[in-house]
Amino acid sequence: MKGGKGGATLPERGQWPDKLVIPAFVGAALFLIAGFLLAFLWAPPVAGAQVDGVELIAGNMVSNKLLLSQKIFYFHMPVALVSFVALAFAAYYSIRYLITQQQRFDTCAECAMKISLVFIICTMITGEMWTRFEWGVWWVWEPRLTTYLVLMLIVIAYFVVRSAFATNASRRCTFSAAVCLLSFVDVPICYAVTRLIPSSIHPVVLREGGLSGDMALTLCVCLIGFMCLGFVLYRLVFGQTRVSQRTAQLIDQVSKQEEAYE
Protein backbone atom coordinates (compact mmCIF):
# COMPACT_ATOMS: atom_id res chain seq x y z
CA MET A 1 0.00 0.00 0.00
CA LYS A 2 1.78 3.12 -1.21
CA GLY A 3 1.24 6.78 -0.63
CA GLY A 4 2.62 9.49 1.57
CA LYS A 5 0.86 11.72 4.05
CA GLY A 6 -2.50 12.83 2.84
CA GLY A 7 -2.52 10.08 0.18
CA ALA A 8 -5.98 8.78 -0.54
CA THR A 9 -5.08 6.05 -3.02
CA LEU A 10 -6.39 2.60 -2.16
CA PRO A 11 -4.46 -0.52 -3.19
CA GLU A 12 -5.06 -2.01 -6.63
CA ARG A 13 -7.23 -5.08 -7.10
CA GLY A 14 -5.64 -8.46 -6.57
CA GLN A 15 -4.74 -8.06 -2.90
CA TRP A 16 -5.29 -11.14 -0.75
CA PRO A 17 -8.61 -9.88 0.74
CA ASP A 18 -10.04 -9.61 -2.79
CA LYS A 19 -9.30 -13.30 -3.34
CA LEU A 20 -11.43 -14.21 -0.32
CA VAL A 21 -14.61 -12.50 -1.51
CA ILE A 22 -16.01 -15.41 -3.52
CA PRO A 23 -15.21 -18.07 -0.87
CA ALA A 24 -16.71 -15.78 1.78
CA PHE A 25 -19.84 -15.28 -0.33
CA VAL A 26 -20.26 -19.03 -0.76
CA GLY A 27 -19.64 -19.53 2.95
CA ALA A 28 -22.19 -16.86 3.85
CA ALA A 29 -24.84 -18.48 1.66
CA LEU A 30 -24.21 -21.98 3.02
CA PHE A 31 -23.98 -21.02 6.68
CA LEU A 32 -26.99 -18.71 6.60
CA ILE A 33 -29.16 -21.31 4.88
CA ALA A 34 -27.98 -23.93 7.37
CA GLY A 35 -28.56 -21.52 10.25
CA PHE A 36 -32.09 -20.76 9.09
CA LEU A 37 -32.93 -24.46 8.85
CA LEU A 38 -31.35 -25.23 12.23
CA ALA A 39 -33.17 -22.35 13.91
CA PHE A 40 -36.63 -23.24 12.66
CA LEU A 41 -36.41 -27.03 12.29
CA TRP A 42 -33.88 -28.29 14.86
CA ALA A 43 -33.17 -25.90 17.73
CA PRO A 44 -35.65 -26.30 20.61
CA PRO A 45 -38.23 -23.60 21.35
CA VAL A 46 -38.37 -21.56 24.55
CA ALA A 47 -37.64 -23.69 27.61
CA GLY A 48 -37.90 -26.77 25.37
CA ALA A 49 -41.66 -26.31 25.20
CA GLN A 50 -43.77 -27.65 22.39
CA VAL A 51 -46.79 -25.37 22.44
CA ASP A 52 -50.13 -26.42 21.01
CA GLY A 53 -52.37 -23.37 21.12
CA VAL A 54 -51.71 -21.39 24.32
CA GLU A 55 -49.94 -22.79 27.39
CA LEU A 56 -48.60 -21.49 30.71
CA ILE A 57 -44.77 -21.58 30.78
CA ALA A 58 -42.83 -20.15 33.74
CA GLY A 59 -45.87 -18.14 34.79
CA ASN A 60 -46.39 -16.64 31.32
CA MET A 61 -49.05 -17.40 28.75
CA VAL A 62 -47.11 -18.56 25.69
CA SER A 63 -48.37 -19.19 22.16
CA ASN A 64 -46.77 -20.41 18.95
CA LYS A 65 -46.56 -16.78 17.83
CA LEU A 66 -44.68 -15.83 20.99
CA LEU A 67 -42.18 -18.62 20.43
CA LEU A 68 -41.04 -16.83 17.26
CA SER A 69 -39.16 -14.43 19.53
CA GLN A 70 -36.70 -17.19 20.36
CA LYS A 71 -36.14 -17.91 16.67
CA ILE A 72 -35.46 -14.23 15.97
CA PHE A 73 -32.67 -14.41 18.56
CA TYR A 74 -30.54 -16.60 16.26
CA PHE A 75 -30.38 -13.73 13.76
CA HIS A 76 -30.64 -10.75 16.11
CA MET A 77 -27.56 -11.53 18.19
CA PRO A 78 -25.21 -12.35 15.24
CA VAL A 79 -26.01 -9.14 13.35
CA ALA A 80 -25.40 -7.16 16.56
CA LEU A 81 -21.99 -8.81 17.00
CA VAL A 82 -21.08 -8.12 13.36
CA SER A 83 -21.97 -4.45 13.88
CA PHE A 84 -19.53 -4.39 16.82
CA VAL A 85 -16.79 -6.04 14.76
CA ALA A 86 -17.28 -3.54 11.93
CA LEU A 87 -17.05 -0.69 14.43
CA ALA A 88 -13.83 -2.18 15.80
CA PHE A 89 -12.27 -2.15 12.33
CA ALA A 90 -13.52 1.39 11.74
CA ALA A 91 -11.97 2.52 15.03
CA TYR A 92 -8.68 0.83 14.10
CA TYR A 93 -8.51 2.62 10.76
CA SER A 94 -9.53 5.90 12.39
CA ILE A 95 -6.62 5.61 14.80
CA ARG A 96 -4.32 4.81 11.88
CA TYR A 97 -5.51 7.96 10.15
CA LEU A 98 -4.99 10.15 13.22
CA ILE A 99 -1.44 8.81 13.54
CA THR A 100 -0.40 8.93 9.88
CA GLN A 101 -2.79 11.52 8.40
CA GLN A 102 -3.12 9.24 5.34
CA GLN A 103 -6.60 9.56 3.87
CA ARG A 104 -6.73 5.98 2.65
CA PHE A 105 -7.19 4.91 6.28
CA ASP A 106 -10.08 7.36 6.58
CA THR A 107 -11.59 5.77 3.47
CA CYS A 108 -11.26 2.29 4.98
CA ALA A 109 -12.89 3.54 8.18
CA GLU A 110 -15.77 5.02 6.19
CA CYS A 111 -16.35 1.70 4.40
CA ALA A 112 -16.40 -0.16 7.73
CA MET A 113 -18.81 2.40 9.22
CA LYS A 114 -21.19 1.87 6.29
CA ILE A 115 -21.24 -1.87 6.98
CA SER A 116 -21.68 -1.23 10.69
CA LEU A 117 -24.69 1.00 10.03
CA VAL A 118 -26.30 -1.68 7.86
CA PHE A 119 -25.97 -4.29 10.60
CA ILE A 120 -27.01 -1.84 13.31
CA ILE A 121 -30.25 -1.22 11.41
CA CYS A 122 -30.75 -4.99 11.04
CA THR A 123 -30.15 -5.35 14.77
CA MET A 124 -32.73 -2.69 15.56
CA ILE A 125 -35.32 -4.28 13.25
CA THR A 126 -34.86 -7.80 14.62
CA GLY A 127 -34.68 -6.41 18.14
CA GLU A 128 -38.00 -4.63 17.76
CA MET A 129 -39.55 -7.82 16.43
CA TRP A 130 -38.22 -9.71 19.46
CA THR A 131 -39.49 -6.98 21.81
CA ARG A 132 -42.95 -7.07 20.24
CA PHE A 133 -43.24 -10.84 20.49
CA GLU A 134 -41.63 -11.16 23.94
CA TRP A 135 -42.84 -8.07 25.82
CA GLY A 136 -45.92 -7.15 23.78
CA VAL A 137 -44.67 -3.66 22.86
CA TRP A 138 -42.49 -2.26 20.09
CA TRP A 139 -40.16 -0.27 22.32
CA VAL A 140 -39.07 -0.18 25.96
CA TRP A 141 -36.70 2.42 27.41
CA GLU A 142 -34.57 -0.37 28.78
CA PRO A 143 -30.77 0.15 29.32
CA ARG A 144 -29.60 -2.22 26.56
CA LEU A 145 -32.06 -0.88 23.98
CA THR A 146 -31.35 2.72 24.94
CA THR A 147 -27.55 2.42 24.76
CA TYR A 148 -27.77 0.66 21.40
CA LEU A 149 -30.09 3.40 20.11
CA VAL A 150 -27.46 5.94 21.20
CA LEU A 151 -24.88 3.90 19.29
CA MET A 152 -26.98 4.05 16.13
CA LEU A 153 -27.42 7.81 16.47
CA ILE A 154 -23.66 8.31 16.88
CA VAL A 155 -22.98 6.25 13.76
CA ILE A 156 -25.52 8.32 11.84
CA ALA A 157 -23.82 11.45 13.20
CA TYR A 158 -20.57 10.15 11.69
CA PHE A 159 -22.00 10.46 8.20
CA VAL A 160 -23.59 13.82 9.02
CA VAL A 161 -20.15 15.11 10.02
CA ARG A 162 -18.64 13.83 6.78
CA SER A 163 -21.31 15.62 4.77
CA ALA A 164 -20.90 18.82 6.76
CA PHE A 165 -17.17 18.98 5.95
CA ALA A 166 -17.39 17.62 2.41
CA THR A 167 -15.23 20.45 1.04
CA ASN A 168 -12.58 20.30 3.77
CA ALA A 169 -10.84 16.93 3.63
CA SER A 170 -8.61 17.47 6.65
CA ARG A 171 -11.42 18.46 9.00
CA ARG A 172 -13.74 15.83 7.55
CA CYS A 173 -11.27 13.03 8.22
CA THR A 174 -10.24 14.27 11.67
CA PHE A 175 -13.72 15.00 13.02
CA SER A 176 -15.23 11.83 11.57
CA ALA A 177 -12.40 9.79 13.13
CA ALA A 178 -13.23 11.34 16.50
CA VAL A 179 -16.93 10.47 16.10
CA CYS A 180 -15.99 6.94 15.05
CA LEU A 181 -13.91 6.45 18.19
CA LEU A 182 -16.76 7.87 20.27
CA SER A 183 -19.13 5.30 18.78
CA PHE A 184 -16.71 2.49 19.58
CA VAL A 185 -16.59 3.62 23.22
CA ASP A 186 -20.30 2.82 23.39
CA VAL A 187 -19.73 -0.80 22.29
CA PRO A 188 -18.52 -2.18 25.67
CA ILE A 189 -21.24 -0.15 27.36
CA CYS A 190 -23.89 -1.82 25.19
CA TYR A 191 -22.43 -5.23 25.98
CA ALA A 192 -22.04 -4.79 29.74
CA VAL A 193 -25.03 -2.63 30.60
CA THR A 194 -27.32 -5.58 31.35
CA ARG A 195 -24.74 -6.87 33.84
CA LEU A 196 -24.04 -3.47 35.40
CA ILE A 197 -27.65 -2.34 35.85
CA PRO A 198 -29.76 -4.89 37.78
CA SER A 199 -33.00 -3.19 36.68
CA SER A 200 -32.34 -4.14 33.05
CA ILE A 201 -34.95 -6.59 31.80
CA HIS A 202 -33.00 -7.52 28.68
CA PRO A 203 -31.91 -11.19 28.89
CA VAL A 204 -28.22 -11.99 29.44
CA VAL A 205 -27.46 -14.78 26.97
CA LEU A 206 -23.70 -15.34 27.18
CA ARG A 207 -23.54 -16.72 30.69
CA GLU A 208 -22.97 -20.15 32.17
CA GLY A 209 -25.91 -22.36 31.30
CA GLY A 210 -27.48 -19.65 29.17
CA LEU A 211 -27.56 -21.80 26.02
CA SER A 212 -27.96 -25.50 25.46
CA GLY A 213 -25.58 -27.26 23.08
CA ASP A 214 -27.95 -27.33 20.12
CA MET A 215 -28.89 -23.68 20.62
CA ALA A 216 -25.22 -22.67 20.83
CA LEU A 217 -24.42 -24.60 17.64
CA THR A 218 -27.26 -22.91 15.77
CA LEU A 219 -26.12 -19.52 17.02
CA CYS A 220 -22.52 -20.16 15.94
CA VAL A 221 -23.58 -21.27 12.45
CA CYS A 222 -25.62 -18.08 12.00
CA LEU A 223 -22.78 -15.97 13.41
CA ILE A 224 -20.25 -17.41 10.95
CA GLY A 225 -22.67 -16.80 8.10
CA PHE A 226 -23.23 -13.16 9.04
CA MET A 227 -19.50 -12.61 9.59
CA CYS A 228 -18.83 -13.86 6.07
CA LEU A 229 -21.64 -11.67 4.74
CA GLY A 230 -20.22 -8.63 6.53
CA PHE A 231 -16.79 -9.26 5.00
CA VAL A 232 -18.27 -9.60 1.51
CA LEU A 233 -20.26 -6.38 1.87
CA TYR A 234 -17.18 -4.54 3.14
CA ARG A 235 -15.07 -5.64 0.19
CA LEU A 236 -17.86 -4.68 -2.23
CA VAL A 237 -18.10 -1.20 -0.72
CA PHE A 238 -14.30 -1.01 -0.69
CA GLY A 239 -14.15 -2.01 -4.36
CA GLN A 240 -16.81 0.52 -5.34
CA THR A 241 -14.88 3.25 -3.52
CA ARG A 242 -11.69 2.18 -5.26
CA VAL A 243 -13.36 2.41 -8.68
CA SER A 244 -14.75 5.84 -7.81
CA GLN A 245 -11.29 7.04 -6.85
CA ARG A 246 -9.74 5.71 -10.05
CA THR A 247 -12.49 7.36 -12.11
CA ALA A 248 -11.96 10.69 -10.37
CA GLN A 249 -8.21 10.44 -10.97
CA LEU A 250 -8.71 9.73 -14.68
CA ILE A 251 -11.13 12.63 -15.05
CA ASP A 252 -8.63 14.90 -13.31
CA GLN A 253 -5.81 13.73 -15.58
CA VAL A 254 -7.90 14.28 -18.71
CA SER A 255 -8.87 17.76 -17.52
CA LYS A 256 -5.24 18.67 -16.93
CA GLN A 257 -4.23 17.37 -20.36
CA GLU A 258 -6.98 19.42 -22.02
CA GLU A 259 -5.83 22.51 -20.16
CA ALA A 260 -2.24 21.86 -21.25
CA TYR A 261 -3.24 21.59 -24.93
CA GLU A 262 -5.18 24.83 -24.68
Give the label of every model feature segment:
Residues 2-262:
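Polytopic transmembrane helical bundles with strong interfacial aromatic enrichment
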